[in-house]
Amino acid sequence: MNNATFNHTNVNPISHIRGSVIITICVSFTVILTVFGYIAKIFTNKKNCTNNVIGLRERIKCSGCEPFCNKRDDISSPRTGVDIPSFILPGLNLSESTPN
C-alpha cells in the first residue's frame, strides 16, 4: 500500500499553459467577432438611412437605425430626450418620442 502514493508535482506546466492560451484565444476571438458584428450592423443601418432625398424633407422610418435617421437639417419630426441607439436596447424603442 505504500507504493500507491501519488505525486501531484508531476503535472506538466506546459500543457496547462497551452490549455489556458487556447481558452483565452477562443474567448478573445468570440469577443472580437461580436464587436465587429455590432460595427458592421451600425454601418449597414447608417447606409440604409436616407431621409433627405432630392431636396424632399421627409423622414423615412427605418427600423434599427433611428439615431442615424435624425439629421441636423431634418425638421419634420423634432425629437427630445436622450438618444439611445436601438442596437444597445433591442427590446425597447426609447428613441422615439412622438406617439403613433
Curated annotation (Swiss-Prot):
Intravirion topology: which positions?
41-100
Q: Name one GO biological process term.
A: proton transmembrane transport
Q: Which residues are exposed on the Virion surface face of the membrane?
A: 1-18
The primary gene name is: NB
Q: Which organism is it from?
A: Influenza B virus (strain B/USSR/100/1983)
Q: What is its main location?
A: virion
**Could you tell me the membrane topology recorded for this protein?**
Single-pass type III membrane protein
Keyword field: Glycoprotein, Hydrogen ion transport, Ion channel, Ion transport, Membrane, Signal-anchor, Transmembrane, Transmembrane helix, Transport, Viral ion channel, Virion
Annotated InterPro entries = InfluenzaB_glycoprotein_NB
- List where the protein spans the membrane: 19-40
User: Record's superkingdom?
Assistant: Viruses
Q: What is this protein called?
A: Glycoprotein NB
Gene Ontology molecular-function annotations: channel activity
The entry's function note states:
Putative viral proton channel. May play a role in virus entry.
Q: Where does the record place a coiled coil?
A: none
Annotated family:
Belongs to the influenza viruses type B glycoprotein NB family.
